[in-house]
From Swiss-Prot:
Keywords linked to the UniProt accession: Cell membrane, Isomerase, Lipoprotein, Membrane, Palmitate, Rotamase, Signal
Keyword Lipoprotein in record: yes
Name of the gene this protein is made from: prsA1
NCBIfam families reported in the protein's UniProt record: PRK03095.1
Highest classification ranks of the organism: Bacteria, Bacillati, Bacillota, Bacilli, Bacillales
Protein name (database record): Foldase protein PrsA 1
Alphabetical list of Gene3D superfamilies matching this protein: 3.10.50.40, Trigger factor, C-terminal domain
Species, as recorded: Bacillus anthracis
Amino acid sequence: MKKAMLALAATSVIALSACGTSSSDKIVTSKAGDITKDEFYEQMKTQAGKQVLNNMVMEKVLIKNYKVEDKEVDKKYDEMKKQYGDQFDTLLKQQGIKEETLKTGVRAQLAQEKAIEKTITDKELKDNYKPEIKASHILVKDEATAKKVKEELGQGKSFEELAKQYSEDTGSKEKGGDLGFFGAGKMVKEFEDAAYKLKKDEVSEPVKSQFGYHIIKVTDIKEPEKSFEQSKADIKKELVAKKSQDGEFMNDLMMKEIKKADVKVDDKDLKDLFEEKKADAKKEEKK
């Protein structure tokens, strides 16, 4: 069970519990003083109001815009129960989440996946239908060191030995830089683009990424066993998972859904929530 799913369900529980009593009703009494619904709501709003409201609105918008069958929800829910076994009911009790609330969260998650799927083009699917390649790399911090390593390779020195000597990647350096086989979408874009241009046993020029500079060597190429048509569903699933982790993409997608739903917030303290998101999206567009 994903923690994010539990968190989404939990925020709904908090908000719903605040709606079940009148504003002056006491939800806690003690010798130290009482707590009313209004006091609780204001405190909750101050500490987590924007996040809670964002989650609740997104849940409603996604479920409204993308139809999810009950059988899809039940299947996903059963998978979660099976994954956590005997701990499942305990986790729900700890979070104060009812089955119905969690299923609503599951429905929203599946609706979000459908929203992402709708953005995936045939070109993207074809671009990600690639052979698996096996590669090694030497990762260094600066361009000067990368050029030095490339020069030493040109002098006939062993790629594996230079990886052990220079590479900053602790996970692969002792294996001579070996990264094993990987497919499309598994590496950062700069690395992947460079690696897929190489032939077997060919070595790249220094490639800059967020991690530093890479010298890449392709050591094997494995052509796909399945046809493109047979692979489409798996490729789409991987792209959905990848895009769901892309904050900029998801913010842009959700803002489009919010705009279509004509969302307006009446609470004076929270009314700018989606305006702030629109501003953030515009900043990203200008970069």
